[in-house]
């Protein structure tokens, strides 16, 4: 009894709040209660088939009142759907019944697959709203109930949201991996290891003298905590590939005036998105266009030409251009080949000057591609000479000859772009899943700081060292939304047969 009371006291005072309390803190709302919710789950507007979802204890009642009987579980049944009061026929469609807990939300649930006309959808929703105990669902409430029921952790919830909003193949693949729990399993594995470490330290504090727990237990904890810290730091050092893929790669087209930057934007977007003119300084503001290049999301920006000018409006455009260069993940530096010096020995100096304006404003993580435009106006011999000059430039970025007019070199540029985007974002199907949310990064950094506290106090005050493990566990738990003090006690009872 002494053991149990000590464990309960310690876990109550110092360990993380229970999962239910954590959920309430995260969402600032309580449990679903006895409400049954309904909503249109498919998109708004006219469509061939619309899906209306119902979840909660009155789901069976809703199906019976609208279709007269409950279909077999998880079987699509063709039914007449009528208003429960007027008995007016609303539609004929498929009805599916999912008894809890084997449903998406963990509750009794149902789906009405009906024709997608606005009048049909409105009629079915009004019929459901006329039933006692049913109310329209709030935004994201079905998924929130799935989280409450333990069907999804927070990383899987975020993966589902990302999948819904995915616009490219790479985004879809990353979201699917996260929704399938690949990222959550990494955090859960670290959480399990940290629970074990904390359980061992707490057992050593309370029972080492009475139960003769060996000192070697703490040495094992030291090694495990150090390895956990290393794994977390490696996970953080991903150059933000997952976050970049999720939000889009910022690509800026930069260079001097009249180099062909706007022509390049129009070529890549395959439409006249930017005004093209032989007059220098035509582009004075940033023009941003979303693109899908090889399955990767790109936010492509055309900018004002970089030059000194007395025009106040153009000066502001140049300032914004330089700001975009500083913020970009990838810079496409455009050079007009017809402006190169005639003497080969001056070419490296000319190119170095153009690149300097961009490179000196770029971060170390930023990638660059040098685009040599107007290649159709330069002979093959001149191109070879320019290629030789590029090789003489130390640290020169990858280069590509291109003609925005004839489209020569476009395939080579797209291949180079795709490979660079793959470097920036990674391949979602290869290797460990990467961080996708800023909050993941924040909580992991806090967890690492807490583990460092364990190392600092380990030989000074073991209780303070244990507090570091608790804080680290709390931070990890906030990523997935799952942490419970009872799980610490389970590990203690399993690993230490104290009191037999």
Swiss-Prot record:
For this protein, what is the EC number? 3.6.1.-
Q: Name any cofactors this protein relies on.
A: K(+)
Transit peptide location: 1-73
**Where is this protein localized, as stated in its record?**
Mitochondrion
Q: Is this entry keyworded Mitochondrion? A: yes
Domain TrmE-type G residues, every copy: 248-422
Annotated residues for binding of 5,10-methylenetetrahydrofolate: 53, 111, 151, 500
- Any keyword Heme? no
Pfam families documented for this protein: MMR_HSR1 (PF01926), MnmE_helical (PF12631), TrmE_N (PF10396)
NCBIfam families given in the database record: mnmE_trmE_thdF, PRK05291.1-3, small_GTP
Function summary: GTPase component of the GTPBP3-MTO1 complex that catalyzes the 5-taurinomethyluridine (taum(5)U) modification at the 34th wobble position (U34) of mitochondrial tRNAs (mt-tRNAs), which plays a role in mt-tRNA decoding and mitochondrial translation. Taum(5)U formation on mammalian mt-tRNA requires the presence of both GTPBP3-mediated GTPase activity and MTO1 catalytic activity.
Task: Kindly give the HAMAP family that the UniProt entry links to this protein.
Answer: GTPase_MnmE (MF_00379)
What's the name of the protein?
5-taurinomethyluridine-[tRNA] synthase subunit GTPB3, mitochondrial
Q: Which organism is it from?
A: Danio rerio
